Every structure is written in structure tokens, then in C-alpha cells.
């Protein structure tokens, strides 16, 4: 009987719990749900196992407060950290979450050095950088969940604008996972037709698309403002699952993620949201898009924002 992949989730809050539920429903692998809060991962694991029986899933879910239980994990998704609250930017979280991430990284290195690691904790581009440097894992094994989520928001808003199914929309969002992200209308399509061409057909306007781009940049903040006590979790979890599945099933899928750049896009030693191909080797390739002067200026501005944050923790 083939052994299930072992998937460890570091952090058992809203995103961690949602991740576990989605992994179980898709039967992607057995789950270890870790948290420092005693009883929380154990209780959620019991609840999730009982929910899984209704769906007919035989996936095993274990709750724990001991990092040793992540030993030998095939994949790890990290959500541990303080969530955003109203009035906070992703960047306000940097000091507290850097300390948390360093501790997580040390334990990942100790117990699961061969795992493929997906970081969700904000501020994303900094946290995934901390994970890489503190763990010493190869950069192709460590990525951040950013562009898949940002693109999903862009997809939704474009589908609403053009009154089509979201399945017809394919969009691209580059840069840091923050207010300076760069949604690219030129590289976004409806059934293969680029947005600029649809504008020329009179189906939308540059003004409307710019409003959608702004709404995409503020997508996470809008949810924080409405929830008041936390941040988005369903969409971030669903986004990470798409990345996880691409790795576990060797799908060689092109997704926009926070990837470690070594000269691509003119960026060195930073994590920034760009299209990559994910398969069983982790990050197989970084895809370099040809940007216009205006797009490159916006991208560079976003990169500078990430650099500035990195400098605050060094």
C-alpha cells in the first residue's frame, strides 16, 4: 500500500485549520497540525477527523505541540505568527513575526530538512526570506504564497467587470505581497484575449481597469477592515493548496509565487512575486516576463519596498 505524503502545518489558526480541511477533502496526504497553544491543534485535529469521515476521507490528522512530530515531512506550510488587525499594514507585523519565523526555521532544519516549504505568514516577502536564511534549506525548496492569492482577487474583479465566469480569466500580479504589488493588465486575459484588446473593443475602460487594480492591491486590507479581529483565511489557504498540489503531484504548473531571485528581473538575493514552474523538484524555473518601461518602474518600486523591510531586520 502506497504511503501517503506527510504534510505539516505550522500554526493551527484560521488558515491552518482551513488548510487541514482542504488537504483532507482532497486526500493530498496525512496531516500534522502544530501549534504552541496547548490543546488547540489536538482539538482541531479531532474535529477535522470527524468532519473527514463524512466526506469519506481516510486521511490521518494529528494535533501536536511538539516539533519532533513534523520529522520527515514531505511538505510544510507555515502560517504561524501574529495576524493583521484593523489599521495594521502587513509590514507592522515584521518584528514579532521575524522572531517566530526564526524559531520555526530552526525546527524545520532540524526535523524536516528535505521538505518543500510554503510560507504564508506576513509580511510575506520578508518572512519567506527569513525562513530561507535561518533554515539553510535550498532556495528551490522554499517559496511564499503571494501571487496566487493576489491573482485570484484580480481574477474575481475582472470576471465581475466583464461579466464572465472566473474560469475564463487568467491574470498576473508581480512584485511584493503588499500595497505596491503590480497587477499586470497586459499579461491578463479573458479566454485568451488580453485585457488591453478588450478595452479597445469597448468592453471596459482604462479607468475601470485602474480601479480594479487598486482594489486588488487593497483586497486583503478590505477584508481585515470588515472582520476587525483578523485577516483573510479561506482564499490564502486555497492558494497555498494549489501550490502544494503542484509540488506533490509534479504538475509542473506555472504559478505566481514569492520566489528567490538571483538576477532574474534584475533582482538579487530577494524574494519577490514572479511566475515560476512548480514540480517535484520544487521551483523548477523562474519565468521572466518582458516588462514595459512603466511596468518595470512599478515592479522596481515594489522590490525597493521589500528591500527596505529586509534592512529593518538585519
Swiss-Prot record:
GO biological process, one term: lactate metabolic process
Family label: Belongs to the LDH/MDH superfamily. MDH type 3 family.
Matching HAMAP family: Malate_dehydrog_3
The name this protein goes by in its record: Malate dehydrogenase
CDD domains per the UniProt record, alphabetical: LDH-like_MDH
Reaction(s) this enzyme catalyzes, per UniProt: (S)-malate + NAD(+) = oxaloacetate + NADH + H(+)
Lineage: Bacteria, Pseudomonadati, Pseudomonadota, Alphaproteobacteria, Rickettsiales
Binding site for NAD(+): 11-16, 35, 97, 120-122
Residues noted as binding substrate in the record, renumbered to the chain: 84, 90, 122, 153
Organism: Rickettsia akari (strain Hartford)
Pfam families: Ldh_1_C (PF02866), Ldh_1_N (PF00056)
Keywords: NAD, Oxidoreductase, Tricarboxylic acid cycle
Amino acid at each position: 500500500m502506497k504511503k501517503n505524503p506527510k504534510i505539516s502545518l505550522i500554526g493551527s489558526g484560521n488558515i491552518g485549520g482551513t488548510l487541514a480541511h482542504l488537504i483532507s477533502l482532497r486526500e493530498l496526504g496525512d496531516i500534522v497540525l502544530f501549534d504552541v497553544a496547548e490543546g488547540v491543534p489536538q482539538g482541531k485535529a479531532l474535529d477535522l477527523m470527524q468532519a473527514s469521515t463524512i466526506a469519506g476521507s481516510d486521511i490521518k490528522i494529528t494535533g501536536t505541540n511538539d516539533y519532533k512530530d513534523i520529522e520527515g515531512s514531505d511538505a510544510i506550510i507555515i502560517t504561524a505568527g501574529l495576524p493583521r488587525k484593523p489599521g495594521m499594514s502587513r509590514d507592522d507585523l515584521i518584528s514579532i513575526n521575524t522572531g517566530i519565523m526564526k524559531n520555526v526555521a530552526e525546527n524545520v532544519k532540524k526535523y524536516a530538512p528535505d521538505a518543500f516549504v510554503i510560507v504564508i505568514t506576513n509580511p510575506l516577502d520578508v518572512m519567506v526570506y527569513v525562513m530561507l536564511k535561518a533554515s539553510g534549506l535550498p532556495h528551490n525548496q522554499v517559496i511564499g504564497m503571494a501571487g496566487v492569492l493576489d491573482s485570484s482577487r484580480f481574477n474575481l474583479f475582472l470576471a465581475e467587470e466583464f461579466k464572465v465566469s472566473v474560469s475564463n480569466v487568467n491574470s498576473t500580479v508581480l512584485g511584493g505581497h503588499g500595497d505596491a504589488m503590480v497587477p499586470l493588465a497586459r499579461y491578463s486575459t479573458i479566454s485568451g484575449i488580453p485585457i488591453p484588446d478588450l478595452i479597445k473593443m469597448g468592453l471596459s475602460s482604462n479607468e475601470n481597469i485602474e480601479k480594479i487594480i487598486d482594489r486588488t492591491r487593497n483586497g486583503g486590507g478590505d477584508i481585515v477592515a470588515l472582520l476587525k479581529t483578523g485577516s483573510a483565511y479561506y482564499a490564502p489557504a486555497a492558494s497555498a493548496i494549489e501550490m502544494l498540489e503542484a509540488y506533490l503531484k509534479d504538475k509542473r504548473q506555472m504559478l505566481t509565487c514569492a520566489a528567490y531571485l538571483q538576477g532574474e528581473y534584475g533582482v538579487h538575493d530577494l524574494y519577490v512575486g514572479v511566475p515560476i514552474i512548480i514540480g517535484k523538484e520544487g521551483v523548477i524555473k523562474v519565468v521572466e516576463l518582458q516588462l514595459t518601461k512603466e511596468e518595470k518602474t512599478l515592479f522596481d518600486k515594489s522590490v525597493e519596498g521589500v528591500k527596505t523591510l529586509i534592512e529593518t531586520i538585519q
